[in-house]
């Protein structure tokens, strides 16, 4: 538990001092608990999401960094994207099976920025309605099927 807290403190400072472009730690979100953060995000310039504002929710288990954080979009504005479900769940392999303790909150943020920035068409995943109706609240409990860089 102490190593998890030490690691989160280090990552918290890194996110406060050197946030990825368009990302800001929501300071209020960490006042009560170091294991749940909200990161405010703005769509990158020159992309389909330019000027749009989103929020990412990070939840860390006591096994972090050996266990990936639970990461999902939250709030009123969930991006319309082929890998983002309308409930905020994100289909991104580094959030599950490709997670490594060498990754960090910053690297997850950069991957999500890159995923949104490379989008050519705003649309939901083809199985959005079914998935949202039947999924677990925790996206990490989903058995994602990654193929051809899509879900």
Swiss-Prot record:
Q: Where in the cell is it found?
A: Nucleus
Q: Which SMART domains match?
A: UBCc
**Membrane-spanning ranges:** none
Alphabetical UniProt keywords: ATP-binding, DNA damage, DNA repair, Nucleotide-binding, Nucleus, Transferase, Ubl conjugation pathway
Kindly give the Pfam families that the UniProt entry links to this protein: UQ_con
Question: Its catalytic activity?
Answer: S-ubiquitinyl-[E1 ubiquitin-activating enzyme]-L-cysteine + [E2 ubiquitin-conjugating enzyme]-L-cysteine = [E1 ubiquitin-activating enzyme]-L-cysteine + S-ubiquitinyl-[E2 ubiquitin-conjugating enzyme]-L-cysteine; S-ubiquitinyl-[E1 ubiquitin-activating enzyme]-L-cysteine + [acceptor protein]-N-terminal-amino acid = [E1 ubiquitin-activating enzyme]-L-cysteine + N-terminal-ubiquitinyl-[acceptor protein]
Q: What does this protein do?
A: Accepts ubiquitin from the E1 complex and catalyzes its covalent attachment to other proteins. Catalyzes monoubiquitination. Involved in degradation of misfolded chaperone substrate and DNA repair.
Name this protein carries in UniProt? Ubiquitin-conjugating enzyme E2 W
Q: Which source organism does the UniProt entry give?
A: Xenopus tropicalis (Western clawed frog)
């Amino acid at each position: 538990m102490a190593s998890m807290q030490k690691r989160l403190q280090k990552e918290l400072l890194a996110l406060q001092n050197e946030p990825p472009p368009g990302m800001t730690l929501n300071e209020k979100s960490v006042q009560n608990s170091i294991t749940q953060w909200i990161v405010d995000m703005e769509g990158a310039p020159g992309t389909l999401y330019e000027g749009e504002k989103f929020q990412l929710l990070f939840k860390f288990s006591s096994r972090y960094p050996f266990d990936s954080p639970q990461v999902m979009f939250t709030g009123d504005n969930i991006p319309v994207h082929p890998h983002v479900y309308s409930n905020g769940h994100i289909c991104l392999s580094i959030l599950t099976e490709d997670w490594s303790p060498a990754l960090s909150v910053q690297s997850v943020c950069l991957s999500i920025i890159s995923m949104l920035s490379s989008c050519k068409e705003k649309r939901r995943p083809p199985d959005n309605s079914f998935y949202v109706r039947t999924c677990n609240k925790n996206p990490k409990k989903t058995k994602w099927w990654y193929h051809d860089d899509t879900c």
